Amino acid sequence: MEKFYTSLGLMSGTSMDGVDASIIRSDGESNYEPIFDKYFEYDGVIYSNLLNLRDKINSIKDLQDNSYQINELERKITLFHAKISKEIIKNAGVDVDIVGFHGQTIFHNAQEKISKQIGDGNLLSSLLKKNVVYNFRENDIHNGGQGAPLAPIFHNLLINQNKIEKPACVLNIGGIANITLVISKNNEDLKSFDVGPGNCLLDEWVRRHTQMKYDENGKASNLGKTSEVILNQAIDNFDNISNQKKLSFDIKDFDLSFVKGLTYEDGLSTLVDFTAIIIYQSILKSINSEENKKLLIIVCGGGRKNLSLMESIRKRLPKNIYLKIIDDYKVDGDFIESQAFAYLAIRSALKKVISFPNTTNVKKPSIGGVLVKNY
């Protein structure tokens, strides 16, 4: 019988607004149980510092030139993670065996073989007196992969544990949207890749025009009118990028210049349809669904709450492909990524594979993450 471990997963996405924290129990294989989830918002100083730093980092040289600021912010980020880890462990009333610490991505460029997350695993281990796994992406990149996406094996676990009929597809709409196609229980049969922008362009447009961080439920975009001319040109331009066969994206791969002259609401509406079409096209291209074969798309991530975006995707799909949100299966769609890194931490500690050729383009199934015990 496999041993079960209690693991805390800490994940901060491209929105840079806070940390999702999840405690789970799992054997690192086909069994898992969610125990406790909570979101912790960054304070205003950390949030603004992260946004400012990300704006400065566009190359490896920029990482070197801003090393002092990066190191200072890394310490603040780690102290914040230590504080919230102690809080969630206390709230959950459980002892944790291991912590999966993703850190905050400030630069990701698969072509240049780099994915930089800030977060000091050694310091976190010392502060928590816990084993910590961090630096999840480096080994995948070292072995020829793109370092992302890493959640597919957890998506596979969710599909199988909830007895969802296969083939099924998990569509995660975070800052970047990614897809996992599950056709069997075998992790090596998984197919996964980044689609393109998820919430990132929408959120950036909102931040530039308002004091808000996102368009709640897509309400503002519903007030606007999409510019079809601008939309079609933007889709053509994106197709040229995607034809380079990139499996992973960074938000720096996209910009808002094509909607610059539009009103706030019209810009949002155009961006919603742009994002929806990219997702729709990727579903059709990658899945090769047979004309009369039903295929379920299960949506997770913050984008599932944007009703305007969801409707824009749904109305374009053929009748044999249909959408459901993961919450319909009594799984909290806000914490899939943090639960995934709790699960990956267990697998990493057990020296189990976390990425595969069809998920990250890595040359061979690869382990990942660095395990530290600094106490």
UniProtKB/Swiss-Prot annotation:
UniProt similarity note: Belongs to the anhydro-N-acetylmuramic acid kinase family.
The record's disulfide annotation reads: none
Q: What does this protein do?
A: Catalyzes the specific phosphorylation of 1,6-anhydro-N-acetylmuramic acid (anhMurNAc) with the simultaneous cleavage of the 1,6-anhydro ring, generating MurNAc-6-P. Is required for the utilization of anhMurNAc either imported from the medium or derived from its own cell wall murein, and thus plays a role in cell wall recycling.
Q: Which HAMAP family match?
A: AnhMurNAc_kinase (MF_01270)
Taxon lineage: Bacteria, Pseudomonadati, Pseudomonadota, Alphaproteobacteria, Candidatus Pelagibacterales
Catalyzed reaction equations: 1,6-anhydro-N-acetyl-beta-muramate + ATP + H2O = N-acetyl-D-muramate 6-phosphate + ADP + H(+)
**According to the UniProt entry, what is the EC number of this protein?**
2.7.1.170
Q: Which SUPFAM superfamilies does the annotation name?
A: Actin-like ATPase domain (SSF53067)
Q: Name one GO molecular function term.
A: phosphotransferase activity, alcohol group as acceptor
Gene3D superfamilies the record matches: 3.30.420.40
The protein's UniProt keywords, in alphabetical order, are: ATP-binding, Carbohydrate metabolism, Kinase, Nucleotide-binding, Transferase
Major enzyme class: transferase
Per the record, the GO terms for biological process are: 1,6-anhydro-N-acetyl-beta-muramic acid catabolic process; amino sugar metabolic process; peptidoglycan turnover
What name has this protein been given in UniProt? Anhydro-N-acetylmuramic acid kinase
Kindly tell me the pathway this chain contributes to: Amino-sugar metabolism; 1,6-anhydro-N-acetylmuramate degradation; Cell wall biogenesis; peptidoglycan recycling
**Source organism (scientific name):** Pelagibacter ubique (strain HTCC1062)
Q: Which residues are involved in binding ATP?
A: 13-20
Q: So which domain of life are we looking at?
A: Bacteria
- Keyword Transferase present in the record's keywords: the answer is yes
